[in-house]
A protein has these predicted regions:
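Juxtamembrane linker/hinge segments adjacent to transmembrane helices in membrane proteins
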Residues: 1-62, 629-644, 670-688
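Von Willebrand factor
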Residues: 76-137, 147-149, 164-172, 180-187, ...
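Acidic, S/T/G-rich, low-cysteine, solvent-exposed domains in lumenal/extracellular/periplasmic regions
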Residues: 191-210, 321-324, 331-530, 553, ...
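Beta-strand-rich binding/interaction modules
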Residues: 235-273, 280-284, 292-301, 546-572, ...
Length: 688
């Protein structure tokens, strides 16, 4: 009925005009032409005024009618809704923008979504860091309880996986029974949180919305890595630690202070400056004044994201090494033991357990840090299997091949278990050859040679084993023939050093050279450091694993957490031994395993490196690959949802347009000098 008012201006115009018979006046024809031109302009203006008045009334009527443009998803707007709030609670959400963290902004956006829920609706809460907790699977019908649950959800230091979180949320919605199904992703849209492949569309077609919580220009430097550069660790010696820094913010680099702490004491510091989007490695040196487990951390000055300014590390400086030696009682074996016990320091540092191959059954291999096999002919199969299992857990091995070595047995049994290349043949019988190339850059030679030049008396050989080359072989010493004399095979599970000629006097004079004892000691220290410091750095959420020795099974085992808490743990018995598995590693810091108070192992748990990359995902890619609708203004998320559910109302725009047209009509009507006189009005009425 309101639209009928649109006709009022037209009816007034039609019924108020007067009709008069024109009387031509010949003497004023020229003046009439001028007058007609003016009247024509006035009539055009009146038509415009009529059009403006008509449109103004039309827009005002439509505005009061509150027209709504319904979306495709709004068909079931009055039906009950099942919604999932997928909350990004990763460490990057702690980034502060104008004094408020992105995580707090995400909670506020979630609270506005809760206010739109009606009786009969249900809500689920999931996080992008852990979607496996049973408490996250139940639906909330009490929205106040859901709000409390949302406010109580803490930040997590685990890696975020938005794609996995969306799949989990979709599974929850698929099992829900309400007609409307909605998914809200509250996140900083970190690029590393999205999988490279697309998320498959679901048949039930839930409405999925991305609510981006973004910082405009954050200034942030991060410690993304700490790596132990020193391969040989000894008390009283210099240790090198490499620290990786990254400018993950949006502002150019500013000078920041980086400090390195050992057992709470600052031992090194440096000023650094990085440009936006760049990384750098800084090398810190300090002297370690104790043995055992060394605990440390690297700290940056405060910035927009505090959580990535601290990174922990740990390493082990051997106190005393248990070294097992398997070999026949020969002159070479005696020279080997003399070299290992050549000083008071080494005799206190090394504890040797020597057995012949026939009695190798009795060697407690699990209690060793290093095993040396010298010119062994054969070993029992059971001993070979024990050695292989021990090596796979990080045990270091020095293997010396010689004339007594049964090449057939070695190629068939020992080499496959240890992952070594087979021996092709023996060479050098009846002749003499010496050493050739030396890789002086390897850590084993650190401290042996003075200066850049490598000079030492080269030993002579008349027998050696030629081994097949392999990609994982690295030659430290080579014969003049080019064949390796000492080579390394290093893998994640353990390292080996292989000598292809024995220390027997009838084979070589290596045992009489000055390089012999230092080379053995450095080799043992190198392998021991590799074995003890393997797997000591983990990411938050990963499992701590430790294999217990037999004598530790009856002791009280505890995991000491960074927050001061203590967890009692119990070993699990498997075919490979007794293991401690501890998964409660959600807090960054240093975790230690203790048996009756004695520390057995220490782990450094840090925020995953990929979580420190603050680059945002590209909007177009995310919308296409994950079927998300982008919410441009998270502060008005409630209005956005209402429009998506019910449709968009345009009454504000229509009323505003009507008022603007009325103002334009008033300005045009009162334009100076354009109001017609009474005579002109009568003339226009007669002309019309």
């Amino acid at each position: 009925m309101g639209l009928a008012a649109v006709a009022l201006p037209i009816l007034i115009h039609l019924f108020t005009r007067a009709r008069a018979k024109p009387i031509p006046f010949s003497s004023l024809r020229f003046l009439k032409q001028l007058r007609n031109q003016k009247i024509r302009r006035i009539k055009i203006r009146q038509i415009l005024l009529l059009l403006l008045r008509t449109l103004a009334v039309l827009f005002l009527v439509l505005g009061f009618a509150r027209p709504t443009c319904r979306t495709q998803s709004g068909s079931g707007a009055r039906s009950r809704t099942s919604a999932v709030l997928l909350l990004d609670n990763s460490a990057s959400m702690a980034l502060e923008e104008q004094g408020e963290s992105l995580f707090a902004a995400a909670r506020e956006a979630g609270a506005r979504i809760i206010e739109l829920m009606q009786p009969g609706d249900e809500l689920y809460l999931c996080t992008t860091t852990d979607t496996l907790e049973g408490t996250e699977r139940r639906a909330f019908h009490d929205f106040q309880a859901f709000r409390r649950r949302l406010e109580a959800t803490p930040l997590s230091f685990r890696a975020t996986d938005i794609s996995a979180g969306m799949r989990f949320a979709q599974n929850l919605l698929q099992s829900a029974h309400n007609v409307n199904k909605e998914l809200y992703l509250l996140s900083d849209m970190q690029a590393t949180g999205f999988a490279a492949d697309s998320l498959p569309a679901r048949e039930f077609n839930p409405r999925q919305y991305a609510v981006p919580l973004l910082a405009s220009h954050p200034a942030n430097l991060a410690v993304t890595g700490v790596r132990l550069r020193s391969a040989i660790l000894e008390r009283g010696k210099t240790v090198e630690v490499e620290v990786t820094l990254a400018n993950s913010g949006q502002e150019p680099g500013r000078t920041k202070l980086v400090q390195l702490f050992i057992h709470g004491q600052r031992v090194a510091q440096r000023m650094v400056s990085l440009e936006r989007g760049t990384t750098a490695q800084e090398l810190f040196r300090f002297i370690v004044d104790r043995d055992g487990w060394i605990e440390g951390y690297v700290q940056l000055e405060d910035d927009a994201l505090m959580e990535d300014n601290l990174r922990y590390f740990t390493f082990y400086v051997p106190e005393r090494l248990n070294v097992g030696v398997i070999g026949e009682r020969t002159a070479g074996s005696e020279l080997l033991q003399l070299a290992l016990q050549s000083s008071a320091d080494s005799s206190a540092f090394l504890r040797l357990f020597t057995v012949v191959p026939e009695r190798s059954f009795g060697l407690a291999i699990d209690s060793l840090q290093l095993l040396l096999l010298h010119d062994v002919s054969r070993l029992p199969d059971a001993v070979v299997e024990r050695i292989g299992a021990w090596h796979s857990r990080g045990g270091g091995i020095i293997l010396v091949l010689g004339r007594r070595t049964d090449i057939g047995w070695y190629n068939a049994r020992l080499a496959p278990v240890l992952g070594l290349s087979p021996v092709l043949a023996a060479f050098g019988e009846g002749g003499h050859f010496s050493l050739g190339r030396v890789d002086g850059t390897h850590p084993v030679f650190s401290g042996i040679f003075e200066g850049a030049e490598i000079q030492f008396a080269r030993p002579q050989f008349n027998f050696a084993c030629r081994v097949a080359s392999a990609p994982d072989q690295h030659a430290l010493l080579s014969f003049s023939t080019g064949d390796p004399y000492l080579y390394e095979v290093r893998r994640d599970e353990g390292a080996l050093l292989v000598f292809t000629s024995s220390f027997e006097p009838e084979v070589s004079d290596m045992a009489y050279r000055t390089i012999f004892a230092p080379l053995l000691h450095r080799s043992i220290s190198y392998l021991a450091a590799h074995g003890q410091n393997r797997g000591v750095e983990l990411s938050a959420g990963e499992v701590l694993r430790y294999r217990l020795a037999g004598q530790e099974l009856q002791k009280q085992l505890e995991i000491h957490r960074p927050d001061g808490g203590v967890d009692l743990v119990h070993p699990g018995i498997t075919a490979s031994g007794a293991w401690i598995d501890h998964a409660a590693t959600g807090i960054p810091g240093l975790y230690s395993l203790r048996a009756d108070g004695k520390r057995l192992a220490v782990w450094a748990v840090n925020i995953p490196a990929r979580e420190l990359d603050l680059r945002r995902a590209e909007r177009e890619l995310v919308e296409d690959s994950h079927h998300l609708h982008w919410v441009d203004d998270p502060a008005r998320i409630d209005q956005f949802i209402r429009e998506e559910r019910i449709g968009r109302e345009y009454w504000r725009e229509l009323l505003l347009a009507g008022l603007l047209l009325l103002l334009l009509e008033m300005a045009l009507y009162r334009e100076k000098g354009e109001l017609p006189s009474e005579e002109e009005s009568q003339e226009m009425r007669r002309g019309s």
